[in-house]
């Protein structure tokens, strides 16, 4: 064939794949140029050249490859859609020598030259062909690319290039890969490249076969499960057991319709949507249990259920007085709060068309532990006959605990607020947010920010719980918060609450509480009668003063409970009457006879006189060790010691502030675990005392004058505060102390030591001192004065502003037994303190 080439042939472009020699293949033509080229070849009995179209084109590049196949048109036929189908017979590979050009007839023609293969070593090529055939047979075992007739054709053929063309055509290679094999005239390299391609294709086919097998197995398993489930459903229908699910769905729809008037539109739609989803979900689906749990939880929320008890402030006052002794100011504020609510209800009934926009305030009871903050909330709930829900916020650091967990999480549930409504079964319970000052922030959010919405009357009408996914009205809930230290509550949250101080009890108040509440309650708990235990007045006073150290009565209750347990033990030891064992026999008594005999025996035992009297003399038998709440004051007046008054989380305390002077250069040393504020107070006090000494407001003893070298006395007198170093100490050094209220006490003790003047031991003081010598007000006055009263202090010096503002809050018992003196400046303090 080479003798007639190169020659110019009509050019056809095949879109999809390369054609190979000795291959008869159908080709579909659509454009006019190709159809004209075929007509020309048929009329002139000419060969044609078919090249494969490129997928990607570069600039100034022909849209087809420069190699293709030379062949003849065996047959052609016109198709209904205007296309032409022809049967092409490939004869030889060819290469385009020059770019194709369009001729006068309107089709492309190009100068074509056949591709000649390089010479090769037949033995070497034969070995490579055998390896290639082996790899092809391996591929044929895992795929359908090589049918048996093609394998036979490969085995019967001896031409290595013909074998390579047959394999390449069967592999359906990508165009660039096929071009690389097609255009290569190195027979050995072609065969080696084909071996690599066949090996990679074998791996791919094996992987696809494994994947298909797994998918098929999974589909079979799925179909099997579906078939079994359908069978199970039919069996359940026959047995009637599937009716329960339908009944549950009907109950959900009925319950939803019954509460529809009380639901917001978004809430109704959300719950209904989930019920509809449940009805479409298979009972064995994992979503079914999640949906059912959500629906039942939301339908348990008491929408439209409210406590109908009309408010009665008289009943509220009676309940508070019944449950709590003293606490006059907190009780008054609570009664005022409910008086406002009662008046609003009365006015609404008279003018129902008028909607009052007044929002209730949030009460927060704050004070030391055990003074009755939570029990006040309990009394409120009893008085207005509403359920009480207590939410402990201490240590809470996950905002989802309040707002609820989103339903995307496993084990999700509504927040504590919604859970509280479900627990109360009313939409207007009394909800106690206990220990609100101990809420913490963490990476899981800031619960205090969620409380802003909950406690804001302007926002809590549409509180959105993440689990519910709709807003819930909390405006009818009475929120009451409790705290020990309001300084730890964030400022925005403090702004939403009204604070009511529940401060420490006096010893007399504790005694009355013990008599009227604690002792009767503990007697009942320990199954003892009032006639069986007598605790004397002196003994009760001793327990309060020596065995407890607290602002409230929680520890006092524990001490009384300890006494009751020991009395109960003593009762059983003194009455060793036990029920005897009986043997079954003919003369065994009936159950009624046994019951009568037991009653008779119990009466005999009860009639026996038993009474334990607890006195100061035998108290040690019932209680272990004393605590010594506040040490009594020293009766002796001393230099360099002053009684200061302090506030602690368990109430007030009397702090002895001591100071020593040591020969030195006028330095001040501070010990006793003092905080930064207290250290600054000491520095201020030292400066104020120096000024008083310089002004000769304070008289100092004479200091030996310095002499010169000749023994003559100098006229210059050394200042006393420059001659000594002061060491100020506050005992109980292991206990951290801070605050500005010890300012006047520190100044007094420094003046005492520098002037060599004793202080009055029966005087105690509290107040912040400024550099100008003024006394500023302080906090915790009630607790401090109660501590002074307990310690036997006779005179307490307090800032004048506290005297004018807070004196009414001081218990009458303390005011009557304590001389409370208001002071404006340090001069008045020193006048009352120094002898």
Curated annotation (Swiss-Prot):
Gene3D superfamilies registered for this protein in UniProt: 1.10.8.60, 1.20.5.5270, 1.20.58.1480, 3.30.230.10, LON domain-like, P-loop containing nucleotide triphosphate hydrolases
EC number: 3.4.21.53
UniProt cross-references to InterPro entries, sorted A to Z: AAA+_ATPase, ATPase_AAA_core, Lon_bac, Lon_bac/euk-typ, Lon_lid, Lon_proteolytic, Lon_Prtase, Lon_prtase_N
Chain residue ranges for the region called Disordered: 574-610
GO cellular component: cytoplasm
Active site: 741, 784
Subcellular location: Cytoplasm
UniProt keyword list: ATP-binding, Cytoplasm, Hydrolase, Nucleotide-binding, Protease, Serine protease, Stress response
Span of domain Lon N-terminal: 9-202
Coiled-coil regions listed: none
Catalytic activity: Hydrolysis of proteins in presence of ATP
GO biological process: cellular response to heat; protein quality control for misfolded or incompletely synthesized proteins
Any one GO molecular-function label of the UniProt entry: sequence-specific DNA binding
Description of what induces expression: By heat shock.
Residues at which ATP binds: 367-374
Highest taxon listed in the record's lineage: Bacteria
Bias-annotated ranges (Basic and acidic residues): 585-609
Domain Lon proteolytic: 636-835
Annotated function: ATP-dependent serine protease that mediates the selective degradation of mutant and abnormal proteins as well as certain short-lived regulatory proteins. Required for cellular homeostasis and for survival from DNA damage and developmental changes induced by stress. Degrades polypeptides processively to yield small peptide fragments that are 5 to 10 amino acids long. Binds to DNA in a double-stranded, site-specific manner.
Assigned protein family: Belongs to the peptidase S16 family.
Quaternary organization: Homohexamer. Organized in a ring with a central cavity.
Entry protein name: Lon protease
Native species: Helicobacter pylori (strain ATCC 700392 / 26695) (Campylobacter pylori)
